[in-house]
Amino acid sequence: MSRVVLVTGGARGIGLACARAFVGAGDRVAVTYRSAPPSGTDAADLFCVSCDVTDAGQVDAAFDAVEAELGPVEVLVANAGITADMLVLRMDDAAFATVVDTNLAGGFRTAKRAVQKMMRARWGRIIFISSVVGATGQAGQANYAASKAGLVGLSRSLAREFASRNITVNVVAPGPITTEMTASLSEDRRTAITEAVPLGRFGTPEEVAETVRFLASDAAAFITGAVVPVDGGLGMGPS
């Protein structure tokens, strides 16, 4: 059955891979972007909407546009996120708050808007994209790790709150994934991360996307409140 899917932060990386996976499955897919929409073949069959998830008004407007074009959102992939890495002693309140406002509060805003129509339909899927560092922590990423850890508490609270309406809420926690965000890593840092991953490599956006697509499917109807790692075993910690 074709569903209406909205992927926030869907212009590149994991978000775009999720959007393309849903399009490939025959779904009607919208993506939000903050700076530039996907282009060329990446944008094929996607409805693209500008949206800053830190602005509740823009979130409402994006959902209104998607609903007018495709219909009510049935699957939400809350992926929009940013980083602002630095050591805590150099991190001011704004650097902490901006990341949390985007990654955590942005997820709250989009999920709150999505469940309004999902409740009426008595069906819905919400998948938050977190990170392995939400569980393990990472030096220089206190803001990012806190925001990603917060998504777990948010998702499990929503999972309990809306279970009676047949709305499932889950988290996917990627490890190191080959994206534009990781492309800037130095070769030494990249090697160190690879050596820490039991499977010995970075993952791909498509591997994350397939996990997300499964959680949105009828096959995952009895899964809610879960945190699914796609991290090559990194989250297990050192052996």
What do the PLM-derived regions correspond to, one by one?
Residues 87-88, 92-100, 182, 193:
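Substrate-binding pocket helix/loop in short-chain dehydrogenase/reductase
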Residues 116, 160-164, 221:
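Alpha-helical segment proximal to the catalytic Tyr-Lys
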Residues 131:
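Residue(s) in the substrate-gating loop at a strand-loop-helix junction
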Residues 111, 147, 155:
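Active-site helix of classical SDR
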Residues 11-12:
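Conserved glycine-rich cofactor-binding loop
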Residues 89, 136-142, 164-165, 200, ...:
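Active-site loop immediately N-terminal to the catalytic Tyr-X3-Lys motif
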Residues 136, 213, 224-239:
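Short C-terminal tail/terminal secondary-structure segment
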